């Protein structure tokens, strides 16, 4: 396909993951040419299996798609409003997952790759960038993610004058569906919740008795684990703790976490409530693969087979992919980046995605979306328009560029940590924003918390729509 030429100089985007792909798309949609540099195809990583753009290396879930009362769902909706290629391809490749938006990981990555390749203003170069962008690349975005190659990571550290922070991330196993014993397991979403493309029976559930649960916990804790080596002392991100680390924190931790039995009824024995339940979520459109929800692990491969086949219904399970462990790195964004994600020490150089310290697929993609819009605006001679902090975009951006800063003279100075989007990042509602249920003098039980979330979600989507309307990135002049 012939690429278009443009009166604008290109913006360079380094990294073709979720954030880099989204950034490139937003820039190109604004009429500015993009050169997207991706090293996979020349050099691999410890976690990626393909050369596809936007490959999902951990879960296949984009989490809740509820835009009425869930912060992640609100972020989904805002990204759709902004023309996100990541959300478009996710919607086109969704698989049933209760109230969540989950995707066929291969179909999703292939769709993103095809869209990027077909865009007339995007050129993809398969090459490793070993240092910071040269000065002649006056506008560039680094979106190399948590697995940034060592040479580039060293260059970033040299430029910022501080070591990148690091944390471990762990990957959950994937099981062949036809090796799961459905005489023991059953299909059901928690509380029978129906989500996008779902039926209320979107998960496979494996029940455990108290005796089976305790035996599983003992084996999990005793299982042979991957050594830390030079990564000793690196903290985990709480949202992706290895399951054995959770078990070590207390025998009941898993039963109140990923193995909680609430909202589930054993179809084979409805009168007996399981002591614990392991859930598996559909991983591909064909329904032939299921991933073990919340079962990210650093157990060695041999131990994984032994321990996970103790779970009722998985005694003969065959694994399409075993779990694993890799190190994620991110910069100290609040001290290094301004509100437009530009490195304070170097004009025109932005960071986006997980390397900025956001956590989660859509969070990473959304920061790529913003970085792309900011870079496109700058290329066109305009000032980047910062989204209101009342939006999911703005709340997450504010956390990254301004969160967790405590003055040097305060004792117990806190460090910046990765964060998923959540309503705790949003500013409080204005007084009187909540209205009590009709005819009621006050909220009952959890009504107030629910009403607060709904009001924050409504405010976010309204403010986001207004922000986008005021800051349209109209495609620029381009010719063949």
From Swiss-Prot:
The keyword Hydrolase does not apply. InterPro entries: FAD/NAD-bd_sf (IPR036188), MnmG-rel (IPR002218), MnmG-rel_CS (IPR020595), MnmG_N (IPR040131), TrmFO (IPR004417). It catalyses: uridine(54) in tRNA + (6R)-5,10-methylene-5,6,7,8-tetrahydrofolate + NADH + H(+) = 5-methyluridine(54) in tRNA + (6S)-5,6,7,8-tetrahydrofolate + NAD(+); uridine(54) in tRNA + (6R)-5,10-methylene-5,6,7,8-tetrahydrofolate + NADPH + H(+) = 5-methyluridine(54) in tRNA + (6S)-5,6,7,8-tetrahydrofolate + NADP(+). Its main location: cytoplasm. Keywords: Cytoplasm, FAD, Flavoprotein, Methyltransferase, NAD, NADP, Transferase, tRNA processing. It is found in: Cytoplasm. One of its GO terms (molecular function) is tRNA (uracil(54)-C5)-methyltransferase activity, 5,10-methylenetetrahydrofolate-dependent. It comes from the Bacteria. One of its GO terms (biological process) is tRNA wobble uridine modification. Its EC number is 2.1.1.74. Its cofactor is FAD. GO terms for cellular component: cytosol. FAD binds at residues 15-20. It is an enzyme of class 2 (transferase). Belongs to the MnmG family. TrmFO subfamily. HAMAP family: TrmFO (MF_01037). This is Methylenetetrahydrofolate--tRNA-(uracil-5-)-methyltransferase TrmFO. The gene is trmFO.
